[in-house]
């Protein structure tokens, strides 16, 4: 019976064939007696209780067996039999009389059952009623048929107790067998699993006592019943009754097996035959081969043939050991007994008994976890064809129960086992569809990402095997589940299936009516999911077939809460957007969930659908999703999806009557120009999930005709169903090589091309997810031009690229909103773009890749496959190139869909470099616009013009690795792209539309534009620092990503000396850069794949040079850039001069090729050499240049610092102390100009920070990136937070604690680059958030002070800057306390000690420190003045004190490393202070000795010594209070750790001692309140030890009584806001008590601090009163705080609540009403 509950829970639903209702008959001639009234209660007056006769139990058979008919007598007959058998109530004993009287007068049978149940113990477990027992049994049987669920449960419980009281000996009473056994068998078909279980347990007890009668009843009333549901239930549950113990009694199962075998020949009810055959299999497994064969041999020949035929069709040659039968009967000799024993040891025929027992071991979770792992291995060898149906059902039942396990690993492993089982079953899973879905539904409410991924795999596999409609039919039965999360996930799975499978696979009308009730669900999330589902349904139905959809909506709108749902659905459809699938298969909603009516993001337009969502109950939960991402803002089904995109796809349809997902017919533009932009606009980066169908493996040959085949692409890939064809989506490939190896595999090879539709914009646009592209190609120029509404891409005929890039790892980043540019292509490749004014702003996008060039001699000219949009070009003089306007491009400009992931970028071959067009502005002006034309002709000399180009010889750079890892190439070459890209974005403000940051740049292609006179330092740089003649008339713009400065790739960059290793001093740079995509939101701009330094005797028209810091720099001057006079008449071969008058944008760092400008004027042709830059190469270069770099660097440092140190030497100690905070101008200037030391490749400069257009989404993405294990992503996330702090501080403040915690964790990161980026991020947080960081000082300062002991100079330097920013911006009092608490106590006091030396220190305190904090600061200063700084602690020596800055080569001295230089001076100051301290009357030696003693005891390793120290401290506080008060900070700094000691005894003693000391010390505790409260509260109020919890509560209460409550206000507010569990409740209640006492004295401060906590509690509290992630019910505490504030503030509280989101005000009003009602 152990397995009975599990199997019962998974009974498949059987159809209700008929209903049965007992009809009452009346006898008018019979007078109504008391007994008949009892029957009347059970018959008529009990209709309220027994209305299940036609409802709950309407599936009873229409006709019953004769035995049942005889038993189910009218109630009058029952009552009369009671009267007759009793002979009157007076004839029974007194107890029977009382119970009978209760049955007469009870309002319902449940009271009678309870009375009978209570009487059982007094009767020794016996029922009594010796003369009325038969009538009683019949009445109970009537209840089992007619009664409601509760009555049946009570009746079965009573019968179970009675049978257990009678024991197992002896036969069943005849009355019991006749009256109750048939009704118990009928109960086996109950829908309620609990009732089935109880009935089965009673039958099991009866089977032991009267097996013959029970088996006969099971056959007659169950297996041979006219009710098909009852027959199936009996057959399914019968094997469960036949346990091993019962079989040992020698039960004769002949009739049972014959009855089951009869059903095998019934072909009309195949399902019933299958159930019967499964029952026989399970019985055979339990009987063993010998006994089962004996039963089968006794079957009639016809039945035996049916059985053998079924056996062969089911198992074929693989017959289980207990079914190994000959066709004509049985073998004479059974199989060896050993086989039987070994196989009988298998539970469910699958798993060993020992493993089964360990799976159910509730004592040791590790044992269960290991057992689940072993179960996976067992299932890997499992053959479903050799396992009986019933065994598999039992096995699924086991998995069903395991999914209830409290251990996550067990649940996750069980899901994996279930998934593996579904895979192994294949198409056979259809037989077990119900149980598998029932088990899977159990975990739908789980919000963990891995759980979501696992059950999505299960459902998708089920849909693949049996079709989506069958799965959804069973799944939608759970749409009324009590858990709203389950309901939401059910709808989401429906959306996923609709987006994955064609509409022909669904019954869309039925699906619409099934999903419609979710539209009026009480929960917002379910409503939103339903709206998204209806959008997909409308898409699947088409525009002309949506009437059924609206009929379904009409049906639910008529409900009580359905008013407005039709408007909501129509508004949702009018948005013309569809949800889509992410990489993991989760659903990403198109419309975000508005958190409140006033807090919607500006990108979400107000509408009836959003109002409908807001009308639902708020059920916000903790956001992990994403982080668990923030589901309210992200709405990615699965919440923790790394692919976050809030830009939704616009519809291609323009007609008013068209739905957003309708296909557009291809239009004709120009000559045979197919427009695909309408289709492509519907696609976005994550519409393309990784799939083997969309990847080309590495090494796949690509030829001229390579393109996607015409096959249907499921909707999870493309939002419209348009097929890809060679006309729309070709892969350009051809050239001199016959085949080409294209690298297209790797992780997350997402194919997105919403970016290539010709739109530009910021985060809100489709272009925000641009990445990098990769291909391998030699000797080919490639360029890309996107014309108006024309879908084009770049790529030559031997390359396969994508116009939008790939991030280095899965996911995409959201970048700040920057203006974007649209650089043109070369007139030698495409004639100048001429675009209409209307389309120019949105649709002119150009991408250019630059790859190194060897020579273009001999390269065949590719034939274009399409006509292209032409451009109008003009030379620098304004003369139009008419002959070029008809040219055709050398490459096909249509979208290429395949791209390789950035993580596997490589340089196995060089890549074509597009020449920059001459006479075309790379950044369009706002003035003139042109018209659209077409190219007619392609010049023959295009492929000959670069003939003379030769690369610069860089062979001496010693790059010996020719087969560099492709994965390394991507990240190292990113830096040049980013540094230039960010600078141009910074400079593009003059030409961007200031009114709309998301708008694209306006085009201007005429040379008469006023932009021609723009500053050279703006228009002289292409995106990667490329300088060309054309760039003299261009402006630049791009979107910066995390900064990667070239100085870390070429360590000699910057203003430092730049020795060259080039062999020839007579070289010219020809072309070494690459333009990034002109779209404005690239998380990782296109990478430069390689460099090619070429030389020419004279720069050609299309030649470019790299400029930037250090290009023509010298030892003594900052790098300069070329002005417009740099290049003069290079067309004629003239030499050019350099003008070093203009500073380039900071951060554009080029390669300093030569220090002498004249070396560029004489050029020789030399052998070309390509340089492939990668991570490994970059490290090698730095290694080889290390000595050289350090040599120049140290010389420069020493030269510049020499005067500084000398000036410092003559300055007074106080002046030196102040200067230690601010380095000299020379040092500062030097550090600013030394990017290799002060800037890492990933950290963005302050000047490069830009605002986000969607800061809420960016914040969520930043937290997700910080949680990623990839260190580069962590740095990206830190840069995001810096941007948010600079421009969106109000958004950042909403999650400041969570963000700060994440940043602090990265400060501890072992990778120095990440650690340093986190320190810089903290510095910016202090700078921009100012006093908002007060609450976070304890954690941030502690980690910064710890980090100050690092050996890396640059980290110490940044830590100093961060601490300086902290001191300058946060509340001074909090800063001082945090510094003292930060672990570096001596140095914290030392900083305050230095500040005291300032002559205006007290004035500054009074000016900047709030009056309420001023007394405490002055007390701290006074203590320092009296006692001095003290000696440096011997037990915690400073790491910096042991370090010598002169011993570290290449270190840049800063304030942190120059402390040793001040050492002697500081000691002098200390000695002066010590002299002052000696004048204090207290014996300083005694005080120091006492401190050493007491702190030694408090910090002792032995817990007994620590307890003695605590007791000693209490004794000293009582007897020598002055000594303790004089050293209170130092003493309690050691004592606070004992308040949360790991030893519970020490912890408890410390708390009790603290409780006693508080009344003694009282206000003397004020300097240490901020350190005490966290130590008292954080762990202790959540302690499971009742003693510790009570002691902590007493300490908090004592603090409230004896310490100024104003000092407690801020710490209590902080703890009430950020603690969780019981501690949060307690601190909130204490805060309410403080408000009551403090408000009259400090009203403004109380409101300022406490209201923040109240809004936090009200805003995050769910309907159940709990907080996400906090645990426990906070409603009562919140109500108390609300009441306290309302009592003090009155109506003003409600007025201030009106400025908060509506749900906060609503919650406040509800709580206030609740408290008022409670008082009444």
UniProtKB/Swiss-Prot annotation:
GO biological process: axoneme assembly; cilium assembly; microtubule cytoskeleton organization; non-motile cilium assembly; positive regulation of microtubule polymerization
Region (TOG 1): 94-312
Keyword ATP-binding: no
Superkingdom, taxonomy of origin: Eukaryota
SMART domains: TOG
GO cellular component: axoneme; ciliary basal body; cilium; cytoplasmic microtubule
Keyword Repeat tagged: yes
Subcellular location: Cell projection, Cilium; Cytoplasm, Cytoskeleton; Cytoplasm, Cytoskeleton, Cilium axoneme
Ranges for region TOG 2: 352-596
Pfam families linked: CEP104-like_TOG
Stretches forming HEAT repeats: 175-212, 214-247, 251-289, 345-384, 390-427, 431-466, 467-504, 506-543, 1294-1331, 1335-1372, 1485-1522, 1526-1563, 1567-1605
Signal peptide: none
TOG 3: annotated segments: 1256-1425
InterPro entries to which the protein is assigned, alphabetical: ARM-like (IPR011989), ARM-type_fold (IPR016024), TOG (IPR034085)
Molecular-function GO terms, alphabetical: microtubule binding
PANTHER family xref list: CLASP, TOG ARRAY REGULATOR OF AXONEMAL MICROTUBULES PROTEIN 1
Free-text note on domains in this protein's UniProt record: The TOG regions are composed of HEAT-type repeats that assemble into a solenoid structure. They mediate interaction with microtubules.
Clinical condition linked: Joubert syndrome 37: A form of Joubert syndrome, a disorder presenting with cerebellar ataxia, oculomotor apraxia, hypotonia, neonatal breathing abnormalities and psychomotor delay. Neuroradiologically, it is characterized by cerebellar vermian hypoplasia/aplasia, thickened and reoriented superior cerebellar peduncles, and an abnormally large interpeduncular fossa, giving the appearance of a molar tooth on transaxial slices (molar tooth sign). Additional variable features include retinal dystrophy, renal disease, liver fibrosis, and polydactyly. JBTS37 inheritance is autosomal recessive.
Protein family (similarity comment): Belongs to the Crescerin family.
Subunit structure: Interacts with ARMC9, CCDC66, CEP104 and CSPP1.
Protein name listed in UniProt: TOG array regulator of axonemal microtubules protein 1
Biological source species: Homo sapiens
Upper taxonomic lineage: Eukaryota, Metazoa, Chordata, Craniata, Vertebrata
Gene this chain is encoded by: TOGARAM1
